[in-house]
Each structure stands twice: as C-alpha cells, then as structure tokens.
C-alpha cells in the first residue's frame, strides 16, 4: 500500500541574524594568524554563520574564494554568502554555492543602485536598488531598507527580497518577498507573472499550479488587504 503525505512542509518568510565579515586583505597567511586566535571563540560555540563582505575588492579574480571559505570553516566560521555592490559578484557567489547580498556603496549609481533622493520636506526617500542582469537559479538579491527594481528575467529557484516595494519588468519565475521587515503597505509589480512564491510582510502564497489565464504571464500587482494577499491584473480596474 502506498501512503502519500500531504502538506509535508510549509514555506514561510523568515529573517535570520547573521554577522558580516568585512574583508580587508586577501593574504591567507595574515588571515590565518588572526583566525588562530579569534577562531577559538567560535569553535567553542560550534559553527557560526557569516556573510563575507568583499566590497574592498573590485574584481573576483583578486581573491582565492575557495581557499578563503575553507580557511574560515576550519576555524568554526561558516561563510553563507557574499556581499558586494557590483552585480558581477553574484555569478561568483553562485559558483561556490553561496548566497549573494547586493550592498550599497558611494558609487551606487554606476554599480546598480539608484541614488537616495530627498522628499520635499527634506526627509530621505526610500533607497532603490536596480538590477539589470538576469537573476539566476540559486541567487538571492536583497534590497535592504529600500525598493527593488529588476529589469532582467528572474529564473526559477532565484529569490528577490526587498524591505519596500518590488518592480519586476521581466518574466518572474522565482520567489518575490516584499515588505520583508513587516511593511504591510509594500506592493509587488510583475510584468509577466510566473512566480513560484510571493510574499508581502511575511504573508505568502506559493503556486503549485498555473494561475488563471488573466493573471498567468500577465502584468499583475500584489498587495495585502485585510491581512490577505490580493493578486490582480494591472489595468483590470
């Protein structure tokens, strides 16, 4: 007799506190000296997760990333992802099965992030991160404290996260999570709706089957109403 287990798991939005290591040198011997002392602290606590901030390095070729990840791991420090303001590092992260976090820098406009503008009352407007390249399977892009605009296709298995709104002007086949820090007014706008999962402020919906024809592969907006996700065709009203 065959037994089928229904609802074996749920997919929910979550946040995990992870420390960041800002790397200042590519010299493995210098790092080893520091980690021999520092690593004892983490080895006593078990494996501790980190994101490796490589903002000080312009080109991926300047780092032996495999050796770096291995070095930190030997001292109880598990590297989960890379952080940089240039999108070229996303492919590097994927190569080594790491997450990618798009960070902010002073040169944000040419590196893919729109500058922070000020509103009429002098207050800072929300930051906007712009991604023009495709987001591939296994990659994650996070627009911290801001909105996210994506003009490249988002593949199945890729994940987009924004603390604010999200605009995707291309086929969306991955996961889209807006209002990640609890902003219930956040919205998601998708040019071609084919997403695996969407979420606003932690309220999510996954899609095991295609949506109705008037929504599937059509422009849609997604928002919260009465603590429920509402998906509607853009221009339908």
From Swiss-Prot:
Pfam families: MinC_C, MinC_N. GO terms for biological process: cell morphogenesis; division septum assembly; regulation of cell division; regulation of cell septum assembly. Keywords: Cell cycle, Cell division, Septation. Coiled coil: none annotated. The keyword Ribonucleoprotein does not apply. Interacts with MinD and FtsZ. HAMAP family: MinC. Cell division inhibitor that blocks the formation of polar Z ring septums. Rapidly oscillates between the poles of the cell to destabilize FtsZ filaments that have formed before they mature into polar Z rings. Prevents FtsZ polymerization. Belongs to the MinC family. This is Probable septum site-determining protein MinC. It comes from Neisseria gonorrhoeae. The lineage of its organism: Bacteria, Pseudomonadati, Pseudomonadota, Betaproteobacteria, Neisseriales. The gene is minC.
């Amino acid at each position: 007799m065959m037994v089928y287990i229904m609802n074996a798991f749920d997919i929910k939005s979550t946040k995990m506190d992870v420390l960041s290591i800002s790397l200042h040198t590519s010299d493995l011997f210098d790092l080893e000296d520091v980690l021999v002392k520092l690593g004892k602290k983490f080895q006593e606590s078990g494996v501790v997760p980190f994101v490796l901030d490589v903002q000080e390095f312009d080109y991926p070729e300047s780092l032996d990333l495999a050796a770096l990840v291995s070095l930190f791991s030997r001292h109880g420090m598990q590297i989960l992802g890379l952080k940089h303001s240039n999108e070229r590092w996303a492919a590097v992260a994927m190569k080594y099965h790491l997450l990618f976090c798009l960070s902010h820098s002073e040169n944000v406009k040419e590196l893919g992030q729109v500058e922070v503008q000020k509103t009429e009352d002098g207050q800072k407007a929300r930051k906007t991160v712009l991604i023009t390249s495709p987001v591939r399977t296994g990659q994650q892009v996070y627009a911290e404290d801001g909105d996210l605009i994506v003009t490249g296709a988002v593949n199945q298995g890729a994940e987009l996260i924004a603390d604010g709104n999200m605009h995707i002007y291309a086929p969306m086949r991955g996961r889209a999570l807006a209002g990640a820090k609890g902003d219930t007014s956040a919205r998601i706008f998708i040019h071609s709706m084919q997403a695996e999962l969407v979420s606003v402020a932690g309220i999510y919906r996954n899609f095991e089957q295609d949506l109705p024809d008037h929504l599937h592969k059509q422009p849609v907006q997604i928002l919260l109403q009465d603590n429920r996700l509402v998906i509607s065709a853009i221009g339908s009203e």
